[in-house]
């Protein structure tokens, strides 16, 4: 179930402070964060945010289409390597 509109978007306070500081100074360095649960807000447009996926920080460049989504949606946590091949089918 989606979040109620009257509550507004959730964003961690420490991340919000980092975003405001980066926008104010015009800094283009990636912002490191572990907060995958924070929602992308309009003030983040044009920033690169390095989102932690459990192993490393994945750089995510924020665009207009991403507003309203969560940061974790753009940093996949699992790698799919495909299913094991069938040995009988390989011989044919």
Curated annotation (Swiss-Prot):
Biological process terms from the Gene Ontology for this record are:
ribosomal small subunit assembly; translation
- Cite the PROSITE patterns for this sequence: RIBOSOMAL_S19
**Keyword NADP in annotation:** no
Q: Name one GO molecular function term.
A: structural constituent of ribosome
Keywords of the record: Ribonucleoprotein, Ribosomal protein, RNA-binding, rRNA-binding
Q: Name one Pfam family in it.
A: Ribosomal_S19
InterPro entries named in the record? Ribosomal_uS19, Ribosomal_uS19_bac-type, Ribosomal_uS19_CS, Ribosomal_uS19_SF
CC per GO annotation: cytoplasm; small ribosomal subunit
Which family does the entry's similarity section mention? Belongs to the universal ribosomal protein uS19 family.
**Under what name is this protein listed?**
Small ribosomal subunit protein uS19
Lineage, highest ranks first: Bacteria, Pseudomonadati, Pseudomonadota, Gammaproteobacteria, Vibrionales
